[in-house]
Amino acid sequence: MPSQFNDNFVATDDDVGTMARVGMALDRELNGDSFQDNLNFQPRSGKREDFEPFFQDTPNTKSLSKHFHDFTMNASLETLPSVEKPRGRNMNAFEETSWNRFRKNGSLFPLSSPPISEPDLRPQALNETPDYRNRFLGAFKKQGVLDDHGNLKLDASPSFLKKPAEYTPLANRQNQNLAFDSPTEALPPKPTTPWRRNGFRSKTTPNLNSGKETPSSYKASARLMEQLGLNHSEPSVDFNNQTSYRLPNLTNLSSLIRDDTIDENGNAKEHDRLPELNTIPVASTDEQLFNAHQLLEKKFEILKRERNECNAKIDELQDKLELLTDAYNREKRRARSLEERMSKEMLTKLGESNVDDGMAASRYDTVKREKERLSEHLKSLQEQYEHIQSVYKNVLLDRESYIMRLGNKISENNELLNENRVLKEKLQTYLDKKESNVTSKIKSTAENSSKPLSMNEADERKDGLNNLLFENKSGANTKEMSNGTETAKENCSPQQDSTSPTSGYQDLVKELAKEIEMRKSLELKLKLSQSNKAGPVKHRKRRPKSKRRITGKVVFDSPNVASGVESDEGSEEISLDSEYSDILSDDGDFEKEKQATLPRRRSSSSMKGNKLAEDSYLNEAGFDWNQGTFHNGSEFGTTGVPDEPNEEELPKHVLKQVEHIINESAAHGVGKCNACHARQEDLIRGEQKVSHSNCLYADQTLRPSQPPSEALKTVVNQLTNELMELKKRYEKLSDRYNSLTPGYHKHKRQEIKNKLIKLIECMESKSDQIYLLYDVNVGKDFS
């Protein structure tokens, strides 16, 4: 059987010992002097304090104040245990304040320290404390240093109750070494025996794994937390002085896109004089790039000459400045020598006794006047010297500005050269692709022609060839129209001449165009045959009674409707006038239809032979763009007005592309258009000849009456003239605005400002229209 007692067992009553320790701690707390320092007391060395680990590491367990609050609740002072009553020697001057504090706070240990993680509460905890708490902290100020064992050297009993060690009982002598600083220290663990339970507490205090013992005072614990680095203080970050990084401008694009009228925030700058609005030509073709390059080279040479002239002027001014400085130094030396000589003469003459006073005075006056004259001459030389220096500085500044401008022009020239090189490469690749596509199409057509044809296909091929022969006959007029364009093509840059296709390439293109037209005619004939097989439509909408077909012409009831509109188009295509304005704003959807090139001119006989009319497009005036062009035996259009000699005509391929853009950008299809569908049915059934009393025939103006390039030129010239007029008016208003004094005429300045803003808006709209027309003219090359 194991022994009932072990070595660590203490043969005392646990409950009695615990209550004794609690009573002594309560005595010191109620006296109020428990935190005074006793300098006479010296702890004994070599002996461990009996109750040293008392109140140790109990932040998560029940404190003594909780225990005392529990068993003293709902009890009067007379019914309290004797341990808690102040009796005997405890009746002193601190009794009243101690019990008043007990009654107010409801706890024996009201001293609570703020959390260490909040450093802002430390000065408040130290400054706003009562007298007993100041005494409590004063002990740590005097003797708050950790010793070798990590304990605080504190005295727990008042000084006036101290007795010599030999007269003090053993129990009191042992209790003098206790340091009951705060109720947060833990009780010692109780021995666990099988026949008795733990006294006073149901649970043992958990032992925290800490390197040092937790000190009882707030100040010492805060210092310990700072030493251990557990104060949770975040590093201070200066958000006001953050380092900003700005990337360098490596592309130099900002100098090309920069607008001087707008600041960094996107607001318009306010100056005394509003900026001038000059249009910048956009170099979008090789010819324009070549011209821009030549202009830049000329400007570069002009700037070089100006720089050389400035250098020569600077050298001349430097030589002149050196001469003036030499003259100034000579005059200065001469004036000094004259002053010295005059002073010597005056001294010698005044020393002589036989000197005539009148002659000396007159000579003195002459010398004084000479001195004043020389001083004035010296001042004039100084002013001249300063003027020459200012001129020299201005010349140096001009030279620096010329150098900067020259550098900017050189950089722009290099960028244009690079852009020109890239465009050349793109053009070469485009031509190679075009040649490959043409050869592939020619091969495919040759293969198709080598195959045997059926009877229907042979008939269709014959009809297509007949139509093609008629178109070749009617195409003689188009050659006259393209004379001016061929002359303009010969005047192009040598770069374009070097990239022009050969004669064999042109023949291949012509053959391909013929093959496409033939296929188009075959497709139309096939559609016609299918519609004949299907038979007439039963439920067809009746056409308006006001329009009747009279041998291919339309009769209108009112004379206001008479215009250049054909009867085949009807009122459905007149509604397309609103779509004509979209041609200038949109770049054109060039892939709405798969057929890129359509036959542009068909005679009346070919239309009757095919019994199907092509779809056309009406412009703003209601005229058809797809009708043939007839020049009446002249080399100009129907207007009869020759081209201006100063303006350059667009080449032939440009005109074709413009016409293609105009035809393709119209949202119109033969299968979807009601008017064209009705026209096809009428052609199938046959024309109805109806007479009408008020017979007004429409003027059959053939379209295009002039080349599209000429029309574009006239519109652009009109818009540029309007823009120039607006600019002149803007300059007049700006001069008037600048003539007004800022001290007066506020209302006038406001009125002129509003007019200037409206003029700027008008000029912007005109410039946008010109820009869109240039897009129409240039965008056809990429279709």
Curated annotation (Swiss-Prot):
<feature type="compositionally biased region" description="Polar residues">
    <location>
        <begin position="201"/>
        <end position="216"/>
    </location>
</feature>
<dbReference type="GO" id="GO:0005737">
    <property type="term" value="C:cytoplasm"/>
</dbReference>
<dbReference type="Pfam" id="PF06657">
    <property type="entry name" value="Cep57_MT_bd"/>
</dbReference>
<dbReference type="GO" id="GO:1905047">
    <property type="term" value="P:mitotic spindle pole body organization"/>
</dbReference>
<keyword id="KW-0206">Cytoskeleton</keyword>
<comment type="function">
    <text>Has a role in meiosis.</text>
</comment>
<feature type="region of interest" description="Disordered">
    <location>
        <begin position="528"/>
        <end position="610"/>
    </location>
</feature>
<keyword id="KW-0469">Meiosis</keyword>
<feature type="modified residue" description="Phosphoserine">
    <location>
        <position position="157"/>
    </location>
</feature>
<dbReference type="GO" id="GO:0008017">
    <property type="term" value="F:microtubule binding"/>
</dbReference>
<dbReference type="InterPro" id="IPR051756">
    <property type="entry name" value="Centrosomal_MT-associated"/>
</dbReference>
<protein>
    <recommendedName>
        <fullName>Spindle pole body protein ppc89</fullName>
    </recommendedName>
</protein>
<feature type="compositionally biased region" description="Polar residues">
    <location>
        <begin position="437"/>
        <end position="453"/>
    </location>
</feature>
<dbReference type="GO" id="GO:0007052">
    <property type="term" value="P:mitotic spindle organization"/>
</dbReference>
<feature type="compositionally biased region" description="Acidic residues">
    <location>
        <begin position="566"/>
        <end position="590"/>
    </location>
</feature>
<feature type="region of interest" description="Disordered">
    <location>
        <begin position="471"/>
        <end position="504"/>
    </location>
</feature>
<keyword id="KW-0597">Phosphoprotein</keyword>
<dbReference type="GO" id="GO:2000432">
    <property type="term" value="P:negative regulation of cytokinesis, actomyosin contractile ring assembly"/>
</dbReference>
<feature type="region of interest" description="Disordered">
    <location>
        <begin position="180"/>
        <end position="216"/>
    </location>
</feature>
<dbReference type="Pfam" id="PF14197">
    <property type="entry name" value="Cep57_CLD_2"/>
</dbReference>
<feature type="region of interest" description="Disordered">
    <location>
        <begin position="434"/>
        <end position="458"/>
    </location>
</feature>
<dbReference type="GO" id="GO:0044732">
    <property type="term" value="C:mitotic spindle pole body"/>
</dbReference>
<keyword id="KW-0963">Cytoplasm</keyword>
<dbReference type="GO" id="GO:0140475">
    <property type="term" value="F:spindle pole body anchor activity"/>
</dbReference>
<dbReference type="InterPro" id="IPR025925">
    <property type="entry name" value="PPC89_CLD"/>
</dbReference>
<feature type="compositionally biased region" description="Basic residues">
    <location>
        <begin position="536"/>
        <end position="551"/>
    </location>
</feature>
<dbReference type="InterPro" id="IPR024957">
    <property type="entry name" value="Cep57_MT-bd_dom"/>
</dbReference>
<feature type="compositionally biased region" description="Polar residues">
    <location>
        <begin position="474"/>
        <end position="504"/>
    </location>
</feature>
<dbReference type="GO" id="GO:0061493">
    <property type="term" value="C:central plaque of mitotic spindle pole body"/>
</dbReference>
<dbReference type="GO" id="GO:0051321">
    <property type="term" value="P:meiotic cell cycle"/>
</dbReference>
